[in-house]
Curated annotation (Swiss-Prot):
Broad class of the protein's primary localization: cytoplasm
Record PTM 2,3-didehydroalanine (Ser), positions in chain: 144
UniProt cross-references to PROSITE patterns, sorted A to Z: PAL_HISTIDASE (PS00488)
UniProt KW Cytoplasm keyword: yes
Alphabetized CDD domains for the sequence: PAL-HAL
Pfam families named among the record's database cross-references: Lyase_aromatic
Record-given protein name: Histidine ammonia-lyase
Entry's Gene Ontology molecular function annotations: histidine ammonia-lyase activity
Catalysed reactions, as listed in the record: L-histidine = trans-urocanate + NH4(+)
UniProt pathway: Amino-acid degradation; L-histidine degradation into L-glutamate; N-formimidoyl-L-glutamate from L-histidine: step 1/3
Length: 510
C-alpha cells in the first residue's frame, strides 16, 4: 500500500501516478488544520450575522436569489447532495474514484471552502479503508464543476448511495460502518463545497496523462525495434539535425532513440553499404512526430499538476479578509484543453505505430518475408493483425476530436457555457487502450522481424525489449491462433514494462 501525507496544494505528478495505481494510506499535514477551522468560522459568522451569501443560505444555480431560512440550512445541504447525484452509466473504476477523492481532499484542505475538518477526515477514512463510492462515469459537463460525480461521492458521507468494497456493491450505510464512520450532518456550504470542483475531470485526465506517458515509452521502444527490423538508418537521430530546429522535445525524443539503438549493432553494421538513400517517414521522422507528442504530454502535465493542486470551489472563503466571493474556478476549461491535447498525442502515437507495422509486413520495403512469416500463401502471418491495428488507429482519429469546443447550456441558461472536460478526460482511457493494442501488434511484428535478422543482433536495450516479449510469446513460425499473442503483448505493455528503458527525466511523472 502506498503511503501519502497530503500537504495541501503540494501534490506532485509522481505522487498522483502512485495514487492512481495503488491502494493508498492517507494522512493530512496537521498544519492544514488552522486554515480550515478559520475558514469554517467565517461561514458560521455569516449565519450568525444573518447575511445573505450565495451557497450558504441561498438556493443554487438559477435559484441563487432564493433566500433559505436558517432552520432549513441543514436540509439545503443534504438536498443538494441527493438531488445532484443524477449520474448514469457504468461506475468509475476504484482507482479513478480514489484519485478523485484525494484531489478533493487536497483542494478542500487548503482552507478556502469553509468546510469543517471532520468532513475531510471522513473522506480520508474512506480511502484508507478502501471503501469507494459508486460513481457513474457519465453525467458531468465540467461546469459548474463535476456536480453529479462529486454528489455520488458525497452521498456515502450521508449514509446514502452505494459504495464498492472488496469488489462488492454495498449500501452507503454499510460503507460508513466498514470505515468506522457515522452519517454526517452537513453544515452550511459543506454540501456545495463537496460538489463544486473539477476533481472528476482532473482524475480522468491524469489517468490519461499517465497512460500517455506509458504509451510514449512503449512506442519509442517499438519504434526503435522497427528501425532495426527494417534495416533502417540511425542517421535521422543525429543530434545535429534536431538541434538546428530548436524544439526541446524533439531533441529529447531523438536522444531516446539514440539511447535505445546505441551507436551501432550487428544488425546496423550489416547494411552499412546498402543502396537505400532514405527511410520512409514512419522510421525517419520519428523524432519529429514523437517530439511533438512529447511536447503535448509535457504541456498537459504542467496544466494538470496545477489543477490537481487548485481550489476549484465556489464561492471561495478568504478568511484573512473576511470575504466570501463568487467566481468560476469550477469551470474545467483548462482540464478539457489539456485532455484534448493528450488525445492528439495518443492518437498520433498509435497512427505512427500502425504505419511502421505496415512497413514491416511489406516485403518490398522491409526486405523481410511477406507478412513476416515463412511459406507465405499457406501462412497468412501478420496480414490481419495489421488490419486490426488500422481499425484501432482509425477509431482513435474520431475519438481525438476536441471535446472542449463543444458546449451546451444547462441550468435554465444560468450555466450557459461548459467545458465538457469530463468526457474529454474519460475518452482518453478508450484511446489509450486502442493505442496499446496497436503497439502490441507492432511489438510482435518488430520482434518477428528482428528474429529474421538472426544471427545478427540489435543493441543491448533492444535485445532486452525483445527478450521480455519472448518470455511470453514465441516466434511465429507458422499460422496459429493469433489473438492470444496480441493479448500477451498488450499485457506486457499495460504493465509499463518498457518505462525503465527510457532516459531519466524524459516524461513528467516518471
Amino acid at each position: 500500500m502506498y503511503s501519502l501525507d497530503i500537504i495541501p496544494g503540494k501534490l506532485s505528478l509522481k505522487q498522483l501516478r502512485e495514487v492512481s495505481r495503488h491502494p493508498t494510506k492517507l494522512s493530512l499535514d496537521p498544519n492544514a488544520l488552522p486554515d480550515m477551522l478559520i475558514s469554517a468560522d467565517v461561514v458560521a459568522q455569516v449565519i450568525k450575522e444573518d447575511k445573505t451569501v450565495y451557497g450558504i443560505n441561498t438556493g443554487f444555480g438559477l435559484l441563487a436569489n432564493t433566500r433559505i431560512a436558517e432552520k432549513d440550512l441543514e436540509t439545503l445541504q443534504r438536498s443538494i447532495v441527493l438531488s445532484h447525484a443524477a449520474g448514469i452509466g457504468e461506475f468509475m473504476d476504484d482507482a479513478t474514484v480514489r484519485l478523485m477523492i484525494i484531489l478533493k481532499i487536497n483542494s478542500l484542505s487548503r482552507g478556502y471552502s469553509g468546510i469543517r475538518p471532520l468532513v475531510i477526515d471522513a473522506l480520508i477514512q474512506l480511502v484508507n479503508s478502501e471503501v469507494y463510492p459508486c460513481i457513474p462515469k457519465k453525467g458531468s459537463v465540467g461546469a459548474s464543476g463535476d456536480l453529479a460525480p462529486l454528489a455520488h461521492m458525497s452521498t456515502v458521507l450521508l449514509g446514502e448511495g452505494e459504495a464498492r468494497y472488496q469488489d462488492k456493491i454495498i449500501s452507503g450505510k454499510e460503507a460508513l460502518d466498514i470505515a468506522g464512520l457515522t452519517p454526517i450532518t452537513l453544515a452550511p456550504k459543506e454540501g456545495l463545497a463537496l460538489l463544486n470542483g473539477t476533481q472528476a475531470s482532473t482524475a480522468f485526465a491524469l489517468e490519461g496523462l499517465f497512460a500517455a506517458e506509458d504509451l510514449y515509452a512503449s512506442a519509442t521502444v517499438c519504434g526503435a525495434m522497427s528501425v532495426e527490423a527494417a534495416l533502417g538508418s540511425r542517421k535521422p537521430f543525429d543530434p545535429r539535425i534536431h538541434r538546428v530546429r530548436g524544439h526541446r522535445s524533439q531533441m529529447d525524443a531523438a536522444l531516446a532513440y539514440r539511447h535505445l539503438l546505441a551507436q551501432s549493432s550487428e544488425i546496423g553494421l550489416s547494411h552499412q553499404c546498402c543502396e537505400r538513400v532514405q527511410d520512409p517517414y514512419s522510421l525517419r521522422c520519428q523524432p519529429q512526430v514523437m517530439g511533438a507528442c512529447l511536447q503535448q504530454i509535457r504541456n498537459s502535465a504542467d496544466i494538470l499538476e496545477i489543477e490537481a493542486n487548485s481550489v476549484s470551489d465556489n464561492p471561495l472563503v478568504f478568511a484573512d479578509d473576511g470575504d466570501i466571493i463568487s467566481g468560476g474556478n469550477f469551470h474545467a476549461e483548462p482540464v478539457a484543453m489539456a485532455a484534448d491535447n493528450l488525445a492528439l498525442a495518443i492518437s498520433e502515437i498509435g497512427s505512427l505505430s500502425e504505419r511502421r507495422m505496415a512497413l514491416l509486413i511489406d516485403s518490398g520495403l522491409s526486405k523481410l518475408p511477406p507478412f513476416l512469416v515463412d511459406n507465405g500463401g499457406v501462412n497468412s502471418g501478420f496480414m490481419i493483425a495489421q488490419v486490426t491495428a488500422a481499425a484501432l488507429a482509425s477509431e482513435n482519429k474520431t475519438l481525438a476530436h476536441p471535446a472542449s469546443v463543444d458546449s451546451l447550456p444547462t441550468s435554465a441558461n444560468q450555466e450557459d457555457h461548459v467545458s465538457m472536460a469530463t468526457f474529454a478526460g474519460r475518452r482518453l482511457g478508450d484511446m489509450a487502450e486502442n493505442t496499446r493494442g496497436i503497439l502490441a501488434v507492432e511489438l510482435l511484428a518488430a520482434a518477428q522481424g528482428l528474429d529474421f535478422r538472426a544471427p545478427n543482433k540489435s543493441s543491448d536495450r533492444i535485445e532486452i525489449a525483445k527478450s521480455l516479449l519472448r518470455e511470453r510469446v514465441d516466434f511465429y513460425d507458422k499460422d496459429r491462433y493469433f489473438a492470444p499473442d496480441i493479448a500477451k503483448a498488450n499485457s506486457l505493455l499495460k504493465e509499463a514494462t518498457y518505462n525503465h528503458l527510457m532516459p531519466e527525466t524524459l516524461l513528467p511523472s516518471l
